Each structure stands twice: as C-alpha cells, then as structure tokens.
C-alpha cells in the first residue's frame, strides 16, 4: 500500500472543482452569487460556445482590495461566515470559500476588481491553478471575472460536457433563476455576442417575469401571500387550468435562494391536482421564507438542494396556502358567472345553431372536453372540435376552408390500409398479436367511455380506445414524415407565440426541421414567433400548446438532434397524442374498424409510449381469478 501523504493545494482544488464545478453553468452560478453577495445592482453575464471557451461576469458591487483579491483564491477563504454558528443565521448565497480557487484550478482565470476609495484596481491572472501575475489596472468600482478554457487542464472532465447548445441552455436557466430571485438587480445575458435578455431593475416580481418569460406568462399568474408559524409563502402562481408540459416554469426559492426542493415541488403539484390537467405541471414562482436555522443549505456540494428541519409542517403549510388561494380565485370567478334574467341565452329555433357553433341537442362532451360525431364504419374514429370560436384555416391553394365537421379527416390525409403491414424479418420475436376483429368477436359494450369489451372463443378482450388510436396515428404520421408528404393547413389568422429566451433559442435551432414537417413558423421579433400553418391533423387551437410541449421536450433533452429519423419518430410520438379525438358516442362498427386499423400497424400490442392497447383474459386466467 502506498504511503499516506497530504495532497498539494493544486490537486486538492481540482478535486473540489469536480464537486462544485460540474459544468459551465456552475461557474456562472458561483460568480453571480458572489456578485449578489457584494451588493451589486447591475450584473452582466457573457459566454461563448456554451461556456467552454469563455464566461465573463461583471458587476458594480463593492469590489475587493488587492489583499482580499489574492486571499479569495485561497481555499476556504471567505468573508461570509467566521464560525459554525453563522450557518444558522446565513444571509448570503456563498459561504464555503471553495468556488474561486476551484474554478481557477481548472481554467484560465482572470480577476479585475476595485473597491470604493481606491485609485486603481487589481488584476490577478491564474492559469490551471498557477499564479501568472498580479498587477494594477484601471476599472470602475466592482469586479469582473473572466473564465476561459474551462477544464483544458482536466481533459477527462471536458469530454463529459454536453453540446454547446445544452450547456448554453443551463447557463441561461441559471441566470434566469437569479434574475427572478433579485428583481431589484439589473441583469444582462449575452451569448456569442447576441443578447439573450436584458432586464433593468424591476420594482415587482411580475415585471421581471414579463421581461424574461413574456407578457403572456405574466398575465396567467396571480399573487399569493400567506404567513403562518414563522413561515411565509409569497410570489405568483398560475390560475386554475394553466399548466405546462414540464417543470421548468415551476420555480421555488427558499430564503431568496433558487433550489430544487422535493418537498415544495410535490406540495405545489398536490395543490394543483384538481386544477391542471393530468400530466401537466403548475405554473408557479414562489418564495418560501423561514428561520435560517430551520433549513440546511449545506447538504449539497453546489447548494442546489435544501433540507427542512420540519418537512411535514412546510409541506402542509404550502398546500393549505395554495389551495386557499385557488379557492379564492374560483369564488371570485363564480361571482361573475351567475347570468341574470336579462342576459340569459335565448332558446334557438329547432335546427338553428346554438352559440359557439353547437346545437342544443349536441351530446355532452367526453371527459376530454370534446364532443364528436362518429365516422361511418370502416373509417378511423377521429374528431375535431372546430366551432365558431375556432380559427378557420386555408388550404394550400389559398382558398378558405370552413370548419371541419366532427369526425372528418382532412381529405389530404391518407387512411391506413386495412391490410396488415409486414413485420421486419430481423425484428426480435414478440408474442403473436391477436387476430383482427372477426365475426367471432362479439362486442359486449363500452365501459367508462374508453374501454371496449369483446367476447371471443378464447375469453375476453379489453381494448383501450385512446391507446389504440395513438398507435394508429403514430404509424400514420411516421409514414407521412418518411415520405415527406405532410399535408398542412395554412391559418387565416396566424397564431402569435411569445417565448422565454431559452425556448426561443431552442425553436430557432429547430424551426427548419418543423417547417419541413407540416408547420410554418416565422420569427416575428425578439422572442416572438408566428405559427402560420400547422399539419392537417392538428387543430389551430392546439398549435400553441403543442409547440410549448415540444419545446419542453427539447429542453428536457428528449430530442435526438443528430439523428433525423429518431427526431421524426419523437415528433410522431408527441403528435399522435394530440391527433386523437375520441367521439363521445361510438358504435360497434366504429370499434371494429378501429381494431382493423390497429392490427394493420407494425406494433398493435402497445401505444407509442409502450402502454398496452388491449388486455386478453383467457378462460384459464378467468378461472384463476374466480378461484375455480
């Protein structure tokens, strides 16, 4: 066994960097926190090539003297705390004194700083942990730190960095969080010479959200304020029904620090259980405050996670506060929802269309909120919900088309043939699928509007209508994408979309791909876009929500950028969910047609997400269940 020895400061700093500096965004985080702790009211962040080649953070904070600038590069040197008890009354973002020496050990690190009362500033240059020079420089009060060639001295770490685009998205997200945490501080963010956002000092959180996320997002929020037993919950939360496809706009702060808190996140999700659709996440920018001694911010190397001393109490408080606010919103709405005798809707004459393009005797909508008329036998059961309030569309020829009747497919969309598709010879062996519906399949009934029950000579078949439709649509769209023949409908009134800077950058990088697959999306100013055409299978009302969900998939990394075929498959998977429109009333012929279409696909056993489309209960299984 080798002898025990004390590591050099350079090696120790590089090891610490592995814990604290995991990617370029972590560098930006540490430098922005230092700027805020220095009392800065203006912070500018600039980076290039995802932070690999350059990151620069400049502030107008208090600055440092020459001695402090050199001491800040020593391990565990900090001005934030002086004893362990200070952790129980922590009022700063940083406190360990590890960040600057760790960053300097794995990069080319240049620091320029000047404190008030000094005639000249100080410049310190460190390369790979080695001090190159210390000299005077001219600069205004404040600090500028430039980090270049990150991880050049540690190639093993550099090769694990993601693409420039991914690393840039993390940096933008980081700066955005601290801009939200401190609305009174002006923030600028520049990527490769392009301004991502520039937000002046904002008097309110709502104005900062409008600057960063867009006015549309800000208008979807309502304030929340609750105080109880030394805990305070403030900020802005989404109105009932307003949800997002990802958690990127469910942001929590603990004592002004942006954190990932399972306790707070799950409390928000539980509070909105009945207020947002299933599979969606609430929109929230909430600030939780408590005694610093009641929360531990020292449980994670990068201080991303916190631990509460009494987590059940915190969770209950947040749930009660949010539910109470949502009830207040609902009660306020109900005050305006009561129609008077003067403005009650007048009865229509028989056969006359009712308001919103529906007839009085139309069947009630399914739980999905869509009424429909089934297709004739032999056609796939899909519906549309175009009404008088829907946006009309233009065919490619330019002629205005009326609203599609419920259940009618656009004529340009080819139907899947009834004949089964061949299975690849080299495919892995799978259980033989059931035979398509035949006269021996006796339709029993439809349960809960979605599950079709068939009786066969072998037992019972329970078919999930939605899952079956998704599989059929998935393979239909895949075929369209492969052939390049994607019919689209041009909108008479383009749909305006305002995005946050990250989403806008992601969309710009992929807009050409989307335009080749049925969309027409055009940039219309900074972070503004117009959807001018959508695929024929999509209703115009779904265009903006679908685009936002798609951008959420981009941001989560669920999008293969380098493989066009995989990208088309992912687009078809997301689109198949939106394309399905379940009619409220379905007959036996329509269900048999659906089964025929399902077994004409390559993988009829599951939907695109891998869930089963049907369940077979044979006689043996039924006997076992009934203990015969």
From Swiss-Prot:
Biased composition (Basic and acidic residues): 357-367
UniProt-listed Pfam families: DNA_mis_repair, HATPase_c_3, MutL_C
GO CC, alphabetical: mismatch repair complex
Annotated spans, Disordered: 334-367
Top-level taxonomic group: Bacteria
HAMAP family for the chain: DNA_mis_repair (MF_00149)
Family of this protein: Belongs to the DNA mismatch repair MutL/HexB family.
NCBIfam families from the UniProt entry: mutl
Protein name: DNA mismatch repair protein MutL
Organism: Opitutus terrae (strain DSM 11246 / JCM 15787 / PB90-1)
